[in-house]
Amino acid sequence: MLFDSTIRKELARSFGATLMVILTIFMTNLVIRTLGLAANGAVAAQDVVFIFTLLALQTLPTILSLSLFIGVILTLGRMYRESEMAIWFSSGIGLARFIRPVIATSWPIVVLIGILMVFVWPWSYSQYNDLRQRFEQRADVLRASPGQFQASGDGHRVFFVEKAASAANAGGRNVFIMNDLGTRESVAVSQSGKIENVGNDRFLVLDSGHMEQNDKVSGEHTHVEFKNYRVLAGTGAAPNNSAPSPRAVDTVDLVLTGGPAYMGELAWRLGLVLGATNLLFMGISLSAANPRRASNWGLLFAALAFVIYYNLLNLTQAWVGNGHVNIVVAMVVLHGLAFALGLGLIWWREHATVIHPMKLLLRRSAA
C-alpha cells in the first residue's frame, strides 16, 4: 500500500540519519573515555581498541532505542509541519493507522536490541571485567607505558621504563625506580632491567646502575653503584572466588539463579527492550506539531519523556535489586503504564477531544 511504503521509507531514512549523528557523538565520548583509562594506567595500552569495542557494544542498545524514538518524532513531526498529515487524515487515515508501518519498520531494530541485551551485554561486561582484573594483577613495572611514570599498587614505588616490558620478553632499558619506605627513600637508575619470577613473586633485576638513598630522620645520604640489583615488583594474586557481577552473568543464569541483585539486572535488560517498543507508541503521539509554527514542542516533550522513562528504568532496577519490589510487579507497573499511556495519547490525538470537568457537570445539570 502507498501509505505504508511511504511511511516506512521516510522512517528508515530519518532513523539512519539520526543514528549516524548519535553514533558520532557517543563514539567520540567513548574514544576520549577509553584513552583516558589508558592514560591513567587503568587498562593496558594494547587493549584500547578491544576495550573501546566492548564499551561501544554496551551503549549500542541505548543508542538504537534513542535513534528509533527520535526518528519517529522527526518523521511524523515533519509531516505535521508540511501538512502531509492533514492530507492523510482527510483521506480517512487516523493516527492509530500509523502504528502498523512504524512497527513494521522498527521491529528488526527492536529484535537487535533484544539480542544485544540478552547475549552481547553480559559477554561484553565479562570480557571488560576480565581485562581490568588481569591488568591489575600484573607486575607494576609491566603496567608501565613507555615514557610514562607508573605508580605501584601500594603507592610506595614509582617506575619509569623507556622501553616497556612485556610478558613474552620481560626486559627494558633505562629503568628508573623511586622507593618510599616512610623514613627512608631511594632512587635507583639502571641501563637495563628484566623480570624474574620466583614462586608467586616477581622481581625486577637491574643491571649496571646506581642508587641514591636518603634517611629522612638523620639526613644521611648514601650513593651506591651496582652491577646487579633485585627489587620486588609484584606478587601473585590470589584467585578471585567472589561472585561475578550481575552485569557479567548470562541471562539464562540470571533466571535460574534468582536473587534480588540478579532479578534487578534482568529487569534492566528486559526493560530496555520493552522500553524501546513503548517509546514507539509515545513517539507517534508526541510528534504532533502545528504547521503554522516553526517550533516543534513535541521534540522537547519527547526528549523529556525519554529521560524520565530511562530514569524510571534505573529506579526499577534498584528497587528490584534491593528486594523492595517483585520483578513481575515492577515490569507490569512501569511498562504496562507506559504502554497504556502511549496508546491513550494516540487515542486522544486522533479524537482531539478533552472532556472538561466543568462541561461535564453542566451537561449533567442540564439533563
Give the location of each predicted region.
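Short, aromatic-rich amphipathic segments at membrane interfaces
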Residues: 52-54, 248-267
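Non-transmembrane, extracytosolic/lumenal segments of membrane-associated proteins
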Residues: 46, 50, 105-219
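A juxtamembrane structural motif centered on a specific transmembrane helix
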Residues: 340-367
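Internal alpha-helical transmembrane segments
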Residues: 54-155, 343-346
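Transmembrane alpha-helical segments that form the functional core of multipass membrane systems
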Residues: 39, 258-349
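Hydrophobic alpha-helical transmembrane segments in multi-pass membrane proteins
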Residues: 14-26, 58-70, 105-114, 272-280, ...
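Membrane-anchoring signal-anchor transmembrane alpha-helices and their immediate flanking context
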Residues: 1-81, 366-367
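Extended, hydrophilic extramembrane loops/domains of integral membrane proteins
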Residues: 229-254
